[in-house]
Amino acid sequence: MLSIKNLKASIEDGTQILKGINLEVKPGEVHAIMGPNGSGKSTLSKVIAGHPAYTVNEGSVTLDGKDLLSMEICDRANSGLFISTQYPTEIPGVNNVEFLQMALNSKRAYLGLEPLADADFKKLCEEKMAMLEMDDRYRDRGVNDGFSGGEKKRNEILQMAILDPKISFLDETDSGLDIDALRIVAHGINQIMSPEKAVILVTHYQRLLDYIKPTYVHVLRHGKIILSGGPELALKLEEQGYDWIEEN
């Protein structure tokens, strides 16, 4: 599914942030990426998404064999990539549900499918909103406009549920969530998952992984994945921090 090989990327002044990332994600897997602040976790998601502030210096990223790095940003999304950001953007004046319908039909057009009928989209949206315990107030508001931090995170998972991506890269989805909101968001992610899909979770905390069980846990430090393991690795990091890890 997603293959990242020797990915190196820098910012405008030439400072290299990613220094050789290697990661293989297969269908049905959940990968958790943990690491100290400034280790390159958010940069990795932005580079995969095609953020213009970053330059890829070396390496490759493919999704189902397709070269993501050569694609326009919209084509990456339409090909099955979903990125949830640490700080979701507010778009005042753009209706939340209309935005979702437009995004979904854009993806369907890219895949050669007819637009989803209004009645069918309404039903789909209502089902996914109910799954995330979102009330009708979300329907008529601007995209993330005036939303609390927790509401923005929940709205991102609604977008993920509607767009039905092959692989989702969720950057600190648990940030700013209380226990109840965390439970709801995690339930939504688990409901969306299937044997054909995959998720990459960036998190600092074990508490998210109590709800969403990772297949693998990776430690990212100084722009490299320096250690990988199973769910037990996250528990050890929770107990001991990162200082015990030696770079190989």
Predicted regions and their residues:
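Q-loop/switch helix immediately C-terminal to the Walker
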Residues: I83-Y87, G93-A109, F121-L124
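The feature captures the beta-strand-to-loop junction immediately N-terminal to the Walker
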Residues: M34-P36
